[in-house]
Amino acid sequence: MLLLWILVLVVGIAYLAHRRVAPLPALGVVAVYLLAMGAWSHAPGWLLLIFWVLIAVVAAPLLLPDLRRQYFTKPLFIWFQKVLPPMSETERDAIDAGTVWWDGELFSGRPDWDKLLAYPKVQLTEEEQAFIDGPTEELCAMVSDWEIGQAMDLPPAAWEHIKTHGFFALIIPKEYGGKGFSAYAHSQVAMKLATRSGDLASTVMVPNSLGPAELLLHYGTDEQRNHYLPRLARGDDIPCFALTGPLAGSDAGAMPDTGVICKGEWEGKQTLGLRLNWEKRYITLGPVATLLGLAFKAHDPDHLLGEEEDLGISLALIPTDTPGVEIGRRHLPLGAAFMNGPNSGKDVFIPLEYLIGGQEMLGKGWMMLMNCLSVGRSISLPAVGTGAAKFTSLVTGQYAQVREQFNVPLSAFEGIQEALARIGGNAWLMDSARMLTANAVDLGEKPSVLSAILKYHLTERGRECIGHAMDVHGGKGIIMGPNNYLGRSWQGAPIFITVEGANILSRNLMIFGQGAIRCHPFVLKEMALAGREDHDQALKEFDGLLMQHIGFAVSNAASTLVLNLGVGHFEKAPGNRLSQGYFRALNRQAAAFALLADLSMMLLGGELKRRERLSARLGDVLSHMYLASAALKRYHDLDSPDHLQPLFTWAMEESLGESERALDELLSNFPNKVLGCLLRVIVFPFGRRHTGPSDAMDAEVAAVIGRAKGDPTLEELLAGCYRPQSAEDPVGALQHAYDLLGASHPLQKKLHTALKSGQVKPAAGEHAIDAALHAGVLQPAEAQTLRDAEAARRKVIDVDDFSKEELTQAEGKVR
């Protein structure tokens, strides 16, 4: 009986903490329970004394704030100031950049699902939809990935179409002659282009991402906006932006490029300006750019502007015909044809008016870049990764039906089904995350942490989809030529892994490294107090935050235990019967994540910055919870249709499984082994619940991408994908073969039955169709239908070959 009283006490305290009941009322409830326990439980006095002492230990700091600050908070504050990792100015700007959105809810340990579901659905305007259905569709039809690769350039007609129809002006407001499209529309355009050609998508997306237009919109002077934005919108100027250098890469803090404040001659007059020296590389659109955005470090050694000498990272806009600018040569990134190359400048003099935002923004360049990068990185590269997944879903699902081995379609093999499921399931999951994040940008957010999550996970999953597609296609994907619709995508996949922050860096340093500070309810505020000079007031504020932080950590520990023991099953959750279980699973994971994140930061302090693999695993948990949230939001917005259950269930099991795997690995490698074992009991009291999609789920998703055009589940998965209809196009030829083989399936079955029964016995060298026609099993029209289907199948299966003369290396073309 006594054990039952103790069990109720422990569970009750955990539940009060889980519900985040205020400390003093919670202590009051516990005190009343202990009085009852003393009266009726026959508990020994020494045990009750221990419980009352524990209550006193907890209550004393709450009831005696002055003593708490003096003997608890003050030493902790001094320790916190010592262990706080040093932070460079560029790191501080990166952390301060952007806004916190749903990532903050996940970090809270208790996400408000009603808040997520209340966000408006993504939607295109009529004008945006017309642009996608019209000029974007037309642009896709104008290009061939193979021909682009042979010419090492887009066709002239495509360049003209891009300029004429404002593809470089998607984000430029209408008052400057641009399209003024939403972030979602921008993402839809980039994704559709990516389903046709990576080179085409890269060419269009860069001016609409981090570049002169974005920077001018946020920080440019009125004169700069009025001059440059209309020219960019019309395509009179082609922009590029130069940040990355040979030695420092994209580490702006180590940038060797300089601009020295000096006087020089400009348009016949002595003018105060900057003398620039720089060397950059990997700059997309650089070889054809007429307007160069440049990042450099500004210095004022002669104090022409003031006492400060090192002014900081600054940004300027420089016409590429300015004397001293060297630009035009090209890189060949894995043979991709989009314009990319180096540029440099030696003693290039520019007036201060060339600074983006004018002299007022001198030295504020890194802050400007970080704020703009969080928006662009939320849209462009996630759209390209999703485009790759949708395209590979389209062609691989059909190819696995068209191509046969051992007289059965490839799609019948379980090994192939596993690859098909990874492609199709990832495509729907990635699309959900892309849509949710673009929606956040349209709601006014600048989601810096979420943009890092999307950049990493959507480009990685895009590369995974291309890899699986190559495995299924086999030799068809390897032999280059006009009929290979996959090879150049495979060649170009590592490019998107590398740009805008290499993925290995994003995962190991940025996602949790930035998110732990930026999204945590208290850490950023506590760090700000640590640097304050008014020590007494800072201590007082730190004390208040510390009490909240401790309550937060205790609550998350209790929630982790309570929810994993099954209490969460009785709590209200939104959604239908299927999705409710997933909302509850994410509640469990969010509580566990918040607990482990807090403990990791407490145990390691500044060392966590160097324990990259622990940081990466915490980032993986946060990332997969976000992907799962996106899938739940999309499923809810579509009114939870039955036909989407295979894709939705796969996406949730994939995300939850990966999140649990990261938690498992984190606990196995936790810095304190004893604490790690204790935490494992709390986080996984019954072991892991989600290990990824089952074989049966994989088979269902594999079947989806092999279905005929018009199937509602397939159409939802492929929405926004360019689908050429001409049988002369290699992708169109695949669709044509799929349709003919589907229509001729009853005849194929009829022929196979006749062959098996011996009704049709082809002579040596005689085709089975001809033998069936002679035997009267097939009518002439039926025989022709089968011949047409087989010819279409053969056209798809065939690969290219070349004569020696055709392979003679032609002189490369440089625009």
PLM feature spans:
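Loop-to-helix element that buttresses phosphate recognition and phosphoryl-transfer chemistry
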Residues: G415-D442, M470, S623-R634
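A glycine-rich, basic-preceded beta-loop-alpha segment at the flavin cofactor/substrate interface
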Residues: P342-R377, L394-S411, N556-L578, A592-K609
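C-terminal amphipathic alpha-helical interaction region
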Residues: M547-R815
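A short core secondary-structure module
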Residues: K269-E326
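Flexible, small-/acidic-enriched active-site or ligand-binding loops
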Residues: P323-F349
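Amphipathic, small/basic residue-rich leader segments at the start of a protein or domain
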Residues: L7-Y15, A26-L35, F51-P207, E214, ...
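Charged, glycine-rich active-site and insertion segments that engage polyanionic ligands
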Residues: E445-G477, P646-S659
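Membrane-helix interface "capping/anchor" motifs
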Residues: A14-G28, H42-W46
